[in-house]
Curated annotation (Swiss-Prot):
PANTHER family: SUGAR FERMENTATION STIMULATION PROTEIN A (PTHR30545:SF2)
HAMAP family assigned to the protein according to its UniProt record, in alphabetical order: SfsA (MF_00095)
Similarity-based family: Belongs to the SfsA family.
Name of the protein in question: Sugar fermentation stimulation protein homolog
Source organism (scientific name): Halalkalibacterium halodurans (strain ATCC BAA-125 / DSM 18197 / FERM 7344 / JCM 9153 / C-125) (Bacillus halodurans)
InterPro entries in alphabetical order: SfsA, SfsA_C, SfsA_N
A Pfam family annotated for this UniProt entry: SfsA
Gene3D superfamilies per the UniProt record, alphabetical: 2.40.50.580, 3.40.1350.60
Amino acid sequence: MFLPFNTRLHHATFLRRPNRFIVEARLDTGEEVVAHLPDPGRLKELLLPEASIWLRHVDNPSRKTQWSVVCSQAPEGDVLVSLDTTLPNQLVTKALQQQEFLPLCQWAYVRQEFTYGGSRWDVLLREGEKQLLLEIKSVTLSEAGVAYFPDAVTARGTKHVKELTAIQQSGDYETAILLLAQREDVTEIRPAYHIDPHFSAALQEAEKCGVRLLGHTSKVTLEGIELGKPVKVDTSERKETSD
């Protein structure tokens, strides 16, 4: 499953990040521009001084910035990493609608943004009389082929995991969490105990209570993003190095 960007990407050099949602960069023409950053995570391993990033131009006079960051180059190689947190939902939803997302291919797509239990869930699926709530998380942090989520403390993410666990235990719906790595150089995904132990413990408990944990990679090019391969999600606590 492939999701095209449908726009030309412009190479730029990362200069600064004044706040979570703004990046200052230098285009190859030498012009310095301000760009919106869709991913509010720390991204400290990607947005390094002089890092290569790619921007798309947004022709919208009402916007504060006329550029948006699309992806960056991983420092350890030629792999591109998507920095647009809206892409995983778009990509996976498109695959689910066509029943081409293999880990859940037996489930039929019903709708996006389904509200239940006080929260809005990314996708609702159905298989016969059973229904499944799916939450999709964007993963960018990776070290030596292992991806970690989250890359910053997420109270909202912890709340969602605990709510899904309660729903699973109630028997009203089946539940699943998909951790989609927005990069291809990943062989395993783990909760980041060294960054957010509360989320990580909640995810481990969710798995014990029957919430399905799915891991998947994606491949990013200058033309678009496509689904990669399923990878293992390991919720066991290990000693990791925190920065």
